[in-house]
Regions:
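Transmembrane helix-loop-helix
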Residues: 1, 94-159
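Membrane-interface helix termini and inter-helical loops of multi-pass transporters
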Residues: 34-43, 103-114, 179-185
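Loop-centered beta-sheet repeat module
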Residues: 39-86
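Hydrophobic alpha-helical transmembrane segments
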Residues: 52, 123-128, 194-207
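Hydrophobic alpha-helical transmembrane segments in multi-pass integral membrane proteins
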Residues: 23-36, 92-103, 162-179
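Membrane-interface helix-loop-helix junctions at boundaries between adjacent transmembrane segments
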Residues: 1-55
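Short, membrane-exposed interhelical loops at transmembrane-helix boundaries
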Residues: 177-196
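Membrane-interfacial helix termini and the short, flexible loops that connect transmembrane helices
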Residues: 1-12, 69-77, 131-149, 219-221
């Protein structure tokens, strides 16, 4: 985009926007299908579509919070507005997905509502919505002079993401395909696992190093 003629930049912007939208909708849809155990009935499709819009709102929310941290002026004010809108959609999506999730798998419902860990696990959604409420309060006060508090929305968004990931992990462990395939069932031959381990040891540090480098390049406003 940076190297094309000015008259073509808008087309590139459109491609980036709709490409990103398609990617997030697809990721959310596939997550929803995975949660249902790869079902294809109407109920599962509806849940997957809800998941698609919820994941898109989540990405838009954390992206807007990142812009609040990295920008100033008119763009920052727009980012604050976007974050407020997306926060409401995200909160509604989390509530809907959480309740529907309990209807999909008996094991998940029993874990959250009937097991001895239920009270402890309920701390996750309570904390999650507490963080969203706190983030909403912070967004109402922004922007403040001197950039005070502009880092808080992104930090709170990260915590919300981590809690949602934790809830999913706890709910569906040890399944790779919920209700059908466990980690132990899917284990490959020991030699194959050793090969994957070597690749992981090489690739993961490279990804982390690249991520750190990118954050350093784009540090500051």
């Amino acid at each position: 985009r940076a190297k094309v003629a000015q008259t073509k930049k808008k087309k590139w912007d459109t491609c980036f926007k709709y490409g990103s939208l398609l990617t997030t909708l697809s990721q959310g849809y596939m997550l929803g299908i995975w949660v249902t155990g790869l079902r294809t009935d109407l109920y599962a499709q509806g849940f997957a579509l809800l998941s698609a819009f919820g994941v898109t709102a989540a990405y838009a929310f954390i992206g807007a919070c990142w812009l609040i941290l990295k920008t100033e002026g008119d763009l920052q004010r727009k980012a604050i507005y976007w974050a407020k809108r997306c926060l409401s959609i995200l909160a509604g999506g989390i509530i809907a997905v959480s309740f529907l999730n309990l209807t999909l798998h008996e094991e998940v419902r029993a874990l959250w509502l009937e097991s001895s860990l239920g009270i402890v696990l309920m701390a996750i959604p309570i904390t999650c919505f507490g963080l969203l409420a706190l983030c909403g309060g912070v967004l109402q006060r922004l922007p403040e002079a001197g950039g005070k508090g502009e880092w808080l929305p992104f930090a709170l968004a990260l915590l919300v993401f981590l809690l949602c990931f934790a809830a999913f992990g706890i709910s569906y462990y040890p399944y790779i395909v919920p209700g059908q395939l466990t980690i132990m069932d899917a284990l490959a031959d020991a030699n194959s696992l050793r090969f994957l381990l070597v690749g992981t040891v090489i690739v993961v540090p490279c990804i982390l190093a690249y991520t750190v480098m990118v954050y350093r390049i784009f540090a500051g406003k």
